[in-house]
């Protein structure tokens, strides 16, 4: 949901947008490159095509019961996707200037009505641990001299779906 709306907004601003997908042959309005995080595969052309990478990848936290297996998938889908991008950027000649990654306000835990900022204390529950690992994976992009930005999403609501 976030990715599609962001893509629309970027197109409206005159940017070219491409997506990564496990099913690039699916009909899409956007140029689409194949990747499969579980198989550690990404089309190298995706990296050479990009000026900036916006990473929103991650298994939904709301779709299934949190079994130990599902929790592992929630964590790994976020961290492994960034690690795959990092490894590909490291070995491929590219002109990527920046890396933007999602994270979540879950890093703060249940804070009630308390106003939170980047300096606020992080929680230590499962979602906070996921967010910390997710952000740590993203920050490694600075080692490649890429401007790195992380934004923390809250609950997403839309007339097309959401929490």
Predicted regions and their residues:
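NAD(P)H-binding glycine-rich loop region in Rossmannoid oxidoreductase-like domains
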Residues: 34-81
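Conserved beta-loop-beta element that borders a ligand/cofactor-binding pocket
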Residues: 103, 136-159
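Conserved Rossmann-fold NAD(P)-dependent oxidoreductase catalytic core, especially the SDR/UDP-sugar
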Residues: 83-125
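N-terminal Rossmann-fold cofactor-binding loop
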Residues: 20-24, 36-37
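SDR active-site strand-loop-helix element
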Residues: 20, 56-57, 99-105, 151-153
């Amino acid at each position: 949901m976030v990715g599609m709306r962001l893509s629309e907004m970027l197109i409206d601003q005159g940017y070219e947008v491409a997506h990564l997908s496990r099913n690039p042959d699916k009909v899409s309005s956007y140029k689409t490159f194949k990747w499969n995080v579980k198989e550690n595969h990404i089309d190298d052309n995706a990296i050479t095509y990009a000026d900036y990478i916006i990473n929103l990848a991650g298994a939904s936290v709301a779709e299934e019961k949190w079994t130990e297996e599902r929790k592992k998938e929630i964590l790994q889908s976020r961290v492994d996707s960034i690690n795959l991008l990092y490894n590909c950027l490291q070995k491929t000649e590219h002109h990527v200037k920046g890396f933007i990654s999602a994270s979540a306000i879950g890093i703060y835990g249940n804070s009630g009505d308390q106003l939170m900022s980047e300096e606020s204390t992080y929680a230590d529950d499962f979602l906070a641990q996921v967010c910390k690992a997710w952000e740590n994976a993203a920050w490694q992009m600075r080692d490649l001299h890429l401007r790195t930005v992380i934004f923390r999403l809250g609950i997403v609501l839309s007339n097309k779906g959401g929490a």
